[in-house]
Amino acid sequence: VGAAEFGAMSGKAVCTGGSILRPEATGFGAVYYLREVLKHDGKGIEGLRVAMSGYGNVGWGIMKKIDELGGKVTYFAGPDGYIHDPDGVCGEEKLNFILEMRAKDPMHCKPYADKFGVDFVEGQKCWGVKDVDVYMPAATQNDVNMEWAKKIAESGVPYYIEVGNMPTTNDALAFLMEQKHLTVAPSKAVNACGVSVSELEMAQNAQRIYWTAEEVE
């Protein structure tokens, strides 16, 4: 047995010493990363259309920050299929409903379509849709395999931003990185903000203080 060493837990609830914005941090950071990628090409998030997978903490954070910066998530997928909302997941009503929906049943996103009268495609993923500007896989590992990667390449969409942990199979990622029209951002860089805010959480704990949302962000 080695020497005893002090450790720390992160991702705690705010009431037990956690940091404000920790649940949203990975999603917010992914959008900030995307903003820098777009800036390099002389573009911005205003008017941007996003197709993504997932609506957990990370996915919800993406939806919220994209909305705040003037873009919109027009497609999002869950385990049971995908949603197409041409107006985007925008505004408090829709964003709050996402929170309620996943709390009641995280395996089904169809209730969103029922609530807001938009399209739901059962048993499919949204990779390959053409009327968006960026794809952001933010759910499970290996979400995008070679079959979906080919659809993504054929769509002509110019940006593929990995947000989840290893959301793309190795062969699919290699294939996507070969596409000259496609800018690919790897997950280890894109989702680093979650870990960064964990560090900020421990810094707050060490000082026995809480930072405001503005200070954390």
Question: Across the structure, where does each feature detected by a protein language model lie?
Answer:
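Glycine-rich phosphate/diphosphate-binding loop of Rossmann-like nucleotide-binding domains
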Residues: 12, 21-24, 28-131
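Rossmann-fold NAD(P) dinucleotide-binding segment
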Residues: 120-134, 142-159
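General beta-strand structural signal in soluble alpha/beta enzymes
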Residues: 4-9, 75-78, 120-122, 136-137, ...
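N-terminal ligand-binding/catalytic initiation module
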Residues: 1-20
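Generic hydrophobic/aromatic pocket-lining and core-packing "Φ" positions
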Residues: 34, 63, 148-149, 173
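Alpha-helix capping and helix-loop boundary segments enriched in small/acidic/polar residues
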Residues: 17-21, 25, 53, 126, ...
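Short glycine/serine/threonine-rich phosphate/pyrophosphate-binding segments
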Residues: 58-62, 143-147, 168-170, 192-194
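Adenosine-phosphate binding glycine-rich loop
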Residues: 153-217
